[in-house]
């Protein structure tokens, strides 16, 4: 798939912008704070209906405007799909093929993107929350069912935590409702964990040969979804549910004492190992960057495997963060397969072959010129 055109209205520092993308590779050049990252973010928001930079949608709306609008035409094997996302202070509304989607979970998936920005290099050494968000965003692109299950889990988790607080402060003494909420939470949690386990195994399958190639065959990358559950069969929801039930029974008194849910997918993590050693703890900066790069490149093949189309790759000021060898490996891997957008302050660091086939855009103070 690829984006044929993009229109922005009142989006961040863009009053209005219209762009045509005819090339597989599109390079956006400009000084810092001119709007390069805002453009990349707009493509990502059109795809995911949320920003990778902020959870406050109001920041996406241009100063003194009531709404922002992003429109794009996505070309796929079976035809073109117009997309539109309107962001207002009341919320977001998305259209696919001119049809308004009732839920944003139904909107997500029409356009698949992979964002690789400097902060993604923290995927390995950052907090578990960063890695959980990575899993949720990437699985959500290829599974609307997962987004529904995750949303349901988060809703029940919030209700359960509220009830635990009431039990803790003795505003409630009847525990019957806690058991009901626990059963509901377990059902949603089992589905979330099963999908995360499946995704982690798929990601490892695609990331291993990429990591081996970058490390010249000297390193083997393995991934482990870290949960306190005893998961012998990740596809058996009843076994996962039983394991949760057992754990919640043991933790009930402690949870009431603390007033919070102590167990579940919201506490899980993904661990990365190179040659059997935890990369986060023992890996060099180079190994951590190679791991992050391998995971991002693996997503390309994973999404292609799931939906039969290659996603769009957004490289936001990340090439300058990679050494020449990793940069060359990245560009060689995607060449000819994936529509790619690259932001940079200078083309000096981009190889000649990539520039030769690229469409070039210059951005200055929210204005784009091809």
UniProtKB/Swiss-Prot annotation:
A UniProt-annotated Pfam family: SMC_N
CDD domains hit by this protein: ABC_RecF (cd03242)
Q: Which GO terms describe its biological process?
A: DNA replication; DNA synthesis involved in DNA repair; double-strand break repair; SOS response
The molecule here is called DNA replication and repair protein RecF
Q: Which NCBIfam families does the entry link to?
A: recf (TIGR00611)
Could you list this entry's UniProt keywords, alphabetically sorted. ATP-binding, Cytoplasm, DNA damage, DNA repair, DNA replication, DNA-binding, Nucleotide-binding, SOS response
- GO MF annotation terms: ATP binding; single-stranded DNA binding
List the InterPro entries hit by this protein, alphabetically. DNA-binding_RecF, DNA-binding_RecF_CS, P-loop_NTPase, RecF/RecN/SMC_N, RecF_2
Q: Where does ATP bind?
A: 30-37
PROSITE patterns recorded for this chain? RECF_1, RECF_2
Q: Does the keyword DNA damage apply?
A: yes
Instruction: Just give the chief location class.
Output: cytoplasm
């Amino acid at each position: 798939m690829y984006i044929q055109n993009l229109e922005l209205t009142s989006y961040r520092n863009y009053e209005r912008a219209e762009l045509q993308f005819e090339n597989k590779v599109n390079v956006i050049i400009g000084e810092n704070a001119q709007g390069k990252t805002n453009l990349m973010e707009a493509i990502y928001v059109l795809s995911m209906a949320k920003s990778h930079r902020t959870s406050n949608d109001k920041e996406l709306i241009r100063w003194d405007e009531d709404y922002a609008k992003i429109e794009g035409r996505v070309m796929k094997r079976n035809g073109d799909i117009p997309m539109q996302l309107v962001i207002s202070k009341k919320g977001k509304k998305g259209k696919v093929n001119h049809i308004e989607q009732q839920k944003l979970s139904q909107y997500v998936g029409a356009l698949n993107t992979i964002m690789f920005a400097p902060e993604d290099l923290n995927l390995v050494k950052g907090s578990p929350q960063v890695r959980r968000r990575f899993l949720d965003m990437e699985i959500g692109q290829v599974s609307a069912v997962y987004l529904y299950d995750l949303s349901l889990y988060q809703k029940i988790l919030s209700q359960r935590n509220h009830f635990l607080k009431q039990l803790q402060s003795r505003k409630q003494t009847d525990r019957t409702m806690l058991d009901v909420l626990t059963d509901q939470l377990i059902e949603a949690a089992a589905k979330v964990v099963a999908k995360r386990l499946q995704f982690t195994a798929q990601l490892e399958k695609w990331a291993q040969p990429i990591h081996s190639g970058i490390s010249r065959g000297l390193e083997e990358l393995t991934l482990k979804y870290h949960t306190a559950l005893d998961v012998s069969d990740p596809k058996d929801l009843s076994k996962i549910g039983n394991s949760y039930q057992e754990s919640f029974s043991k933790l009930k008194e402690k949870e009431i004492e603390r007033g919070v849910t102590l167990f579940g997918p919201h506490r899980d993590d993904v661990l990365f190992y190179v040659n059997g050693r935890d990369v986060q703890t023992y890996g060099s900066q180079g190994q951590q960057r190679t791991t992050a790069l391998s995971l991002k490149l693996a997503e390309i093949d994973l999404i292609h495997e799931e939906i039969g189309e290659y996603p769009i790759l957004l490289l936001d000021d990340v090439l300058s963060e990679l050494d020449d060898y990793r940069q060359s490996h990245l560009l060689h891997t995607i060449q000819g397969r994936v529509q790619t957008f690259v932001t940079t302050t200078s083309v000096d660091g981009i190889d000649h072959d990539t520039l030769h086939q690229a469409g070039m855009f210059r951005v200055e103070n929210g204005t784009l010129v091809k």
